[in-house]
């Protein structure tokens, strides 16, 4: 009975590890794919967002409203990646947790390899394998998510920054964003209509 429970717990952990936040292409160490690109001929509005912070839905809502109001604007969105050191830590943890879970399951003592005595927490893990595996998995996932979360919601129009959550500390309201875009579009039209003087 205990072996069946252990097998079920291990199966659930492996399934969650494959589908967990550290393993997804959107948040892992691999560069994130584009969230969406609307094919149009006008200016490019680019969003760089923290997907692991839950901003994808906000981006999709903004994109829907903006594409209705400004049909000529091209809209791109991508994951704003954290600094390389945090990406490497998250990648290391995603592999390390699987190795550690494997060692707990097979009962192999890694401390004996280094000629050290196993600490009491390792002994506890061997006596409570399911709980130990779950604890390692969820604790590691929590740290991975923290490493990958940037809190970013950066917006540029033709590579000119128009909003930065990292600087302002909050997301723009839809009204703010529309007002910013209106001002930028009017400025662009005004600049294009000015006569070019030759030197």
Swiss-Prot record:
Q: InterPro entries, alphabetically?
A: Selenoprotein_Rdx-typ, Selenoprotein_T, Thioredoxin-like_sf
Question: In which domain of life is the source organism classified?
Answer: Eukaryota
One example of a Gene Ontology biological process annotation? positive regulation of cytosolic calcium ion concentration
The main location class comes to endoplasmic reticulum
Reported function: Selenoprotein with thioredoxin reductase-like oxidoreductase activity.
Pfam families listed in its UniProt record: Rdx
Leader sequence range is 1-24
> From which organism does this entry originate?
Gallus gallus
Protein name, please? Thioredoxin reductase-like selenoprotein T
Task: Specify the cross-link site (Cysteinyl-selenocysteine (Cys-Sec)).
Answer: 50-53
């Amino acid at each position: 009975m205990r072996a069946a429970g252990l097998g079920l717990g291990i199966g659930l952990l492996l399934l969650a590890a494959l589908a967990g936040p550290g393993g997804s292409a959107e948040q892992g160490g691999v560069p994130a794919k584009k969230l969406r690109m609307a094919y149009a001929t006008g200016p490019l509005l680019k969003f760089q967002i923290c997907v692991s912070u839950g901003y994808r839905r906000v981006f999709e809502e903004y994109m829907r409203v903006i594409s209705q109001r400004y049909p000529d604007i091209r809209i791109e969105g991508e994951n704003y990646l954290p600094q390389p050191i945090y990406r490497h830590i998250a990648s290391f943890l995603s592999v390390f947790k699987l190795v550690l879970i494997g060692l707990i399951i097979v009962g192999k003592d890694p401390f004996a390899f280094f000629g050290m005595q196993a600490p009491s927490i390792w002994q506890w893990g061997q006596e409570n394998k399911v709980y130990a595996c779950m604890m390692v998995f969820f604790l590691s996932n929590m740290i991975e998510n923290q490493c990958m979360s940037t809190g970013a919601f950066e917006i540029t129009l033709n590579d000119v920054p128009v909003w930065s959550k990292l600087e302002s500390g909050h997301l723009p309201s839809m009204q703010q964003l529309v007002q910013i875009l209106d001002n930028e579009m009017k400025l662009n039209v005004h600049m294009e209509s000015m006569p070019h003087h030759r030197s």
